[in-house]
Each structure stands twice: as structure tokens, then as C-alpha cells.
Amino acid sequence: MLRHALLLPLLLGSSVAVAASDLPGQQGPTAALLQGGGLQLSTRRTAELFPDGNRIWKVELHRGPTLLASWPAASGVAGRQSADRRWSPGNAAPLPAGLYSLGRPEPWGNDLWFDLTPRFGTTRSALGIHRCYPGTGCICIPERADIDALARWVKASGIRSLKVVN
């Protein structure tokens, strides 16, 4: 039986997904992970859904092709995922795709807020990353431990941009 358990990863090859908890930067930066620069922060919609039907987004930290951390998030409410994302403020649509300037984490009540400033034309404003659920247009990270880990990365590495992929 042990032989089969050891062969399974070899047989499945790259189709085995890495659990977020296994990613080297999931809990925050280490001195070794901060070496080398070239960090990119992005977020993307997935095909996955939270139990209540809201779309799962992923906030991901990469160095080149290597995924260092991945945190589940939400943006927009379930019924508004295909609404106009660029020109209709207040419609609960997800964050528009594009490049954003990322502010440093700052206190927001008992939580954290990262300001997001679009680097493209849009009528959307007051955008950010914060802890909430469900999302109503910002990037909402439901778990406190996840937003705290992201804050440690942003503070320690100086990341100042976020790409919304899709």
C-alpha cells in the first residue's frame, strides 16, 4: 500500500494542486523569500464558488513563474459578476481588470485597508483591499490571518502595484 501512495504523485504529475498552506510565503515573508526582488502581486477570478454562490478570487504573490502565496478573496456580489466593471460605480460589480497602484496597509477600524488607485480610465473610485465578505466591488479577503500575511509582504517588500488579471 505504501508503494502505491509513493507512486501516486509521480503518476499524477503536475495535475496535483499545491495546497495554499504548502506555499512558502503563505504566512508572510521570510528573510530568504525577500531576497531576489521581482515580486508581482495579482488577483484573478476563478471558476470556483464559495458555498453561498459568490465567486472565489485569488490574490497571488509570484516571483517570476513561482507562486509564493495565494489567498482566497471575493470581489463583487454573486449576481453582479458580469455587470459593467469600469464605468458604473456603486453597482456591486467586481474590480475592473488592469494595473493599480497599491498603497501600504493602514488601520481601518479594527481591520486593514490597502488603497488601490487605477492606472487607467474609470469612473470607479474608493477602491481597495480589505477584510470583508461578500465583496461589493473592492478586493475582499475574508480571513484575518490572510490579510495580515499580505500586509506583512507589502510592508517588508515594498510591493506597490496590483494587477487584476480578469
Residue ranges and their predicted role:
Residues 135-143, 147:
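Active-site nucleophilic cysteine motif
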Residues 19-133, 148-160, 165-166:
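Cell wall/extracellular polymer interaction/catalysis modules
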Residues 4-5, 89:
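Hydrophobic alpha-helical context, especially transmembrane and signal-peptide helices
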Residues 12-13, 131, 140:
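Generic detector of well-ordered secondary structure
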Residues 5-15:
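Bacterial N-terminal signal peptides
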